[in-house]
Each structure stands twice: as structure tokens, then as C-alpha cells.
């Protein structure tokens, strides 16, 4: 394995730290055929960006290549323009109804309360004591609904995450399909409730002026927003806390970084949870010197592309002068992340809360990573949370 760029995504060594494997893949084969996956694997930034942006050739909707897709899986993430355009516009319009100031205030209060509660002589697990509950509350408030039952929702959400690796482990597929159906039922209940406000209510109203969007498509798409908003945010928050515990100087007032937005952008690039995104080729063509045929699956390793030295100087470190907006952590083109603003808000608020409350983070044990390849995330992050001092200064 050390001499061959081939890698097995669920190998414990890869799960613990995939980036050395990504680097060898990128250096040896920016685009290559992975026999076990039965797909092309893309590790370079240029080719990855091309795949994500070209929906005419590389489809998210596998039905365009004649492959059946379960009805419960059809949502805005699995559609391409022009079918994708209507549901995305509907959701973007609904986003404008989210009260941003109230959202920011709520998030700040929640983070501050949890960090203060965790400051003790004993280490705390910041995955379950902070990142997961904060992210669930944030996406629920963003949608304008009460947070679902944490234990049940966590079980369904995790089943969906694990099913994303069903191409590597088929035993994970069935539980994921069941979980998607259950969460779609939850969202359908929200849509049927006349008392709902905010994003969900705005999405329901918008559907009445877009009759081509079915109730099932809207429910499935909101389920995807709920799930992605929770899992992506919570996993990124966990990874950000780990990096900040290892490098507390990142929040130093004398840092060369030009404010919280630059740091947030770099953490998405370096520590974004979404490792890979798949497409299917619907028209023969060339990609990175390889001939890609109709029906071939193409997997873009976003985490590899985001550390491509051809685009990012010192690609494995936080860059004090980042080239913002070039990473693929939020996708590209038609399928760029709807929740990018919420992710950035959570990161900026985390920075402020740590600085304003004089909180220091000290690792108190070895972090543990989940055995999932498509979405990377911590299962445990033991940290000593200490309140060192208080200051009123914070980034704007």
C-alpha cells in the first residue's frame, strides 16, 4: 500500500488519516479507475471542479444513464437542471425568510451556554457535549421547527451516513433507505402543520406557486437539507474544535489571518466532512487524460482536491492569505451547498464565543474517528475546557 496509490476507503489506517493516501493518489493518478469501487476516482482540483460544474456530461441524477433510483432518494441533491432548478429556487426563496439576526443571537447564546457548562476540572467530550447538540439546534431553528427527538434522530441520521458507503459495504444500504423514509415522514408532518413558521412554512407557500414540484419531492428535499445541515455542520464543528485545540494560536489577535471569514473558509477547505461526491457520465468524453464513457461512475474526492498544491500553497496548513472561494468544500455549480451561510455563521460564532469568554481548549486524550468514508467525523473528542480570561473583543 505504501508504494501503490490504490487505497481502500474503509481501511482503519485511511479512516484515521486519509490525507497521506489522498496525496499519493493525486500525485500518481489525478484521475484513475478504482477496480473495487467500479468507478473513476478524481483527486485533482481542476478535474474535480470540471466534473462538479458540468451537469450536461456528469449527472447527479443516475436515471439519466438508465439506472433506477428509489423514489425516497429523489430530492434536489439527485436532480440536474432543468428539473433541479425549480426546487432549488423554491428553497433559496425560503432561505430569505430565515431571520438572520435572531438566528445568530440564538446560536451565540447556545454555544456560550454549552461551553461554559463544559468548563470543569474534568475533560468533556466536545462531540456529544457540544458539536452534535449545537448543530441539531441550529438546523432546526434554521428550518423554523422544534428540534426532533435527539436519540431517535441521531439513529436515523447515522444510518443515512453509513449507507453512503454502501458501495463499499452493501450491508449498510437497507437501514439507510428505512431512515430516509422515516425522516421524510417527519418533514411531511412539518409541512402539513399550519402552525409552522420560517423556512418550512415559506417552502410550503412557495410550492403553491410552483405546481410542478410534488409534495414528495419537497419533503425529500427538505429532509436532505435537514440531514446535510446537521451532519455536515456537526462534523465540521468537531474537526474545527480539534484543530483549534491543537493550534490555539489560530485565534490569536495577532494572527495574520484577515478575520474570521478567512479562517472559516480555510477550515472548510481543510476539515470539511464531505470527502467524496459521485456523478455518472451521460456522454463520452475526456477527463484528466482518461476516456470516460457513458454509464461510468465518477467519484470526486473533494478532500483531496481541496489540498491540491497546484491551487493551494502549503495545502495541508491554514493559509494566512487564503484564496477564498476556490475550494470545493461547498461543491460547485448547480449543486453548490445551500447551507454554506449557516456553516460559516456557526464557525464565526464559535470563534467569537471562544475569544469573548477567554476559553482555552486542551486535548485530554486521543480523538476517535467514525468508520465512515463519504462523511468523515469524530465520534469522540476529549478536551479540557478552561475559562482563562474574559475580553470584549471579537471579530466582526
Residue positions per predicted region:
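Cytochrome P450
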Residues: 1-396
